[in-house]
Amino acid sequence: MAAAVAAAARGCWQRLVGSAAPARVAGRPSVLLLPVRRESSAADTRPTVRPRNDVAHKQLSAFGEYVAEILPKYVQQVQVSCFNELEICIHPDGVIPVLTFLRDHSNAQFKSLADLTAVDIPTRQNRFEIVYNLLSLRFNSRIRVKTYTDELTPIESSVPVYKAANWYEREIWDMFGVFFANHPDLRRILTDYGFEGHPFRKDFPLSGYVELRYDDEVKRVVAEPVELAQEFRKFDLNSPWEAFPAYRQPPESLKLEAGDTKPEAK
């Protein structure tokens, strides 16, 4: 009886396992070969490139022309990038009127200030470019508003239009030194008290002007001028194993004695 039950159980087990029945591997005991799903765990690293949408491109271009017609006093340039992003360059005096128009107009409704930053281009007369990135959740659209200024001319604060511009403008003032007029609390936000200069300017030295260290004698952190003095060092880059020494050393020129104007012809 027991033998019959064992045989029935063994037959049922073989039917359930099917192709995954026990098999004998050479040199090893019997193992159960189970199907294994082999897939590469490496993620696809190809960049995601949005295709150009001709319909959206035309709509943004038409809207940019519409804004230029409504505010011709302030809008100086309108362009649409290849990724369907509208850019409007305005006069510095038009920050409040243009941003208010884009926020409140029924066909715009750019009610969110996604980002506010600056770019330093020292070769320009107005070296600082202020960039406002706006978002319209109603129309799922973005727009970039650009204006410009120099080291001394202030820009009107956009805090009355977008409350989110408060800390953005403080950061621009701290990093670039662009002054925003009528800002409710324009003070440094990232650097320490008494910091000299503005670190994101292209003419700011990489080492800075002062360094902070803990003074064990006075038991506090002190600020001292940066000192990067070192002895003169000469680096000899020539090597006896140089494969192409001609590219390392310039060809020797004939030495002329006093009074000679050209070397003698041989």
UniProtKB/Swiss-Prot annotation:
Major localisation: mitochondrion
GO terms of molecular function: NADH dehydrogenase (ubiquinone) activity; NADH dehydrogenase activity
Ubl conjugation among keywords: no
InterPro entries the record matches: NADH_DH_suC (IPR010218), NADH_quin_OxRdtase_su_C/D-like (IPR037232), NADH_UbQ_OxRdtase_30kDa_su (IPR001268), NADH_UbQ_OxRdtase_CS (IPR020396)
One Gene Ontology cellular component: respiratory chain complex I
Subcellular compartments: Mitochondrion inner membrane
Record membrane topology: Peripheral membrane protein
Transit peptide: 1-38
Keyword entries, A-Z: Electron transport, Membrane, Mitochondrion, Mitochondrion inner membrane, NAD, Oxidoreductase, Respiratory chain, Transit peptide, Translocase, Transport, Ubiquinone
UniProt EC number: 7.1.1.2
GO terms for biological process, alphabetical: mitochondrial electron transport, NADH to ubiquinone; mitochondrial respiratory chain complex I assembly; reactive oxygen species metabolic process
Catalytic activity: a ubiquinone + NADH + 5 H(+)(in) = a ubiquinol + NAD(+) + 4 H(+)(out)
Record HAMAP family: NDH1_NuoC
Subunit-structure text: Core subunit of respiratory chain NADH dehydrogenase (Complex I) which is composed of 45 different subunits. Interacts with NDUFAF3. Interacts with RAB5IF. Found in subcomplexes containing subunits NDUFS2, MT-ND1 and NDUFA13.
Function: Core subunit of the mitochondrial membrane respiratory chain NADH dehydrogenase (Complex I) which catalyzes electron transfer from NADH through the respiratory chain, using ubiquinone as an electron acceptor. Essential for the catalytic activity and assembly of complex I.
Family: Belongs to the complex I 30 kDa subunit family.
Matches recorded under PANTHER family: NADH DEHYDROGENASE [UBIQUINONE] IRON-SULFUR PROTEIN 3, MITOCHONDRIAL, NADH DEHYDROGENASE UBIQUINONE IRON-SULFUR PROTEIN 3
Protein's UniProt name: NADH dehydrogenase [ubiquinone] iron-sulfur protein 3, mitochondrial
Organism: Bos taurus
Taxonomic lineage: Eukaryota, Metazoa, Chordata, Craniata, Vertebrata
